[in-house]
Amino acid sequence: MAQIDNYDLFFSKMISDNITSKLFMKLTITIIITLVIIFIIFTLIILYFIKNKKQDHCINCKVENLDSSIKIDKNNTQKDYPSNFGFVEFPSELLGYNPKKFDNYAYIH
């Protein structure tokens, strides 16, 4: 009788180990397949964005038509604009006015 109980325990343990190993294998295969599918989807998304990337910058662009209202004055040292603002007269260095900085700038008339 004791041997039958040992055989029963051996076979029941073998069957339970077999079931858990099958479940573990199914779980690992499912996880691996899911990760492969996610990897493929992300690579396809990245390839789509690389191929359909908009070019926001312009290389060697030429300006065809300038509006006549824009005039570029290259030698203006802001003689039309005073260095003081308001009623109190400040030194121009405190206001950040430096005529050497404004030699080349564009302004709209």
Curated annotation (Swiss-Prot):
It comes from the Viruses. It is found in: Membrane. This is Uncharacterized protein V15. Keywords: Membrane, Transmembrane, Transmembrane helix. Its main location: membrane. One of its GO terms (cellular component) is membrane. It is a single-pass membrane protein. The chain crosses the membrane at residues 29-49. The keyword Transmembrane applies.
